[in-house]
UniProtKB/Swiss-Prot annotation:
Residues 114-206 are lumenal. Keywords: Membrane, Peroxisome, Peroxisome biogenesis, Transmembrane, Transmembrane helix. It holds the Pfam family PEX11. It comes from Oryza sativa subsp. japonica. GO terms for cellular component: peroxisomal membrane. It is a multi-pass membrane protein. This is Peroxisomal membrane protein 11-5. Belongs to the peroxin-11 family.
Length: 233
């Protein structure tokens, strides 16, 4: 493949990536929290970028609550323990509520919804839902990692080291394990972000800390949305 063809292929992947509304939202989120880190809650250009980007992001999330509402009423995967099913449904319910309330907050900040006090109150409830959903996600990921670890250890006992490298089932479990570790890190970062936005620990979780954690979790989200690499034949 020539350098021109390689560049065209890379650009095609970039276009495919940027065509995703979710990807654009996460890029804007990285800009938002990066600006929050720079501003540290102080007035100035960085804080203006933080506020304007936050408002712009809400447009990307219009009717996004339907996704988690659908997941809430969908049957769980076979073999999933009941506690994990309940945690998963709680996560879906909380995230769906957060995204729904976020639309009212957007309407309040754009002047469509006139009751500003009610909009700010709903904004606080929305952030509590965001905190709850990420807490559920963290617990789920820890439990799923334990389940994966047990099944991987069982395979390790049955197969030799060289066979493990070639075993497709083991490699799939290893990939899932890495994905879940990354999801656990992201949800843990977002818990700190939610605590910062709710000002539950203002002395420890300052706007700069919130910005740093939010920026890191946004970069992880951007990475998670990258197209899967093509398998070599």
């Amino acid at each position: 493949m020539s350098s021109l063809e390689s560049a065209r292929a890379d650009l095609a992947l970039l276009i495919l990536y940027l065509n995703k509304a979710e990807a654009r939202d996460k890029i804007c989120r990285a800009i938002q929290y990066g600006s929050k880190f720079v501003s540290n809650g102080q007035p100035g250009p960085a804080q203006n970028v933080d506020k304007s980007t936050s408002l712009a992001r809400k447009v990307f999330r219009l009717f996004k609550f339907v996704n988690d509402l659908h997941a809430l009423i969908s049957p769980p995967a076979k073999g999933t323990p009941l506690p994990l099913i309940l945690l998963g449904k709680s996560k879906n319910a909380l995230l769906s509520t957060f995204l729904f309330l976020d639309q009212i907050v957007w309407a309040g900040r754009t002047g469509i919804y006139k009751n500003k006090e009610r909009a700010e109150f709903l904004s606080k409830i929305a952030f509590y839902c965001f905190l709850g959903s990420n807490t559920c996600t963290s617990i789920i990921e820890v439990a799923e990692l334990q389940r994966l670890s047990k099944s991987m250890k069982k395979l390790e006992k049955e197969l030799k080291h060289q066979e493990l490298l070639k075993n497709e089932q083991y490699q799939m479990k290893l990939q899932k394990c890495n994905e879940r570790r990354l999801a656990l890190i992201k949800s843990s970062l977002d818990i700190v972000v939610a605590i910062g936005l709710l000002q539950l620990a203002p002395k420890k979780v300052t706007p700069r800390v919130t910005g740093a954690f939010g920026f890191a979790s946004s970069l992880i989200a951007c990475y998670q949305l990258l197209p899967a690499p093509a398998k070599s034949k």
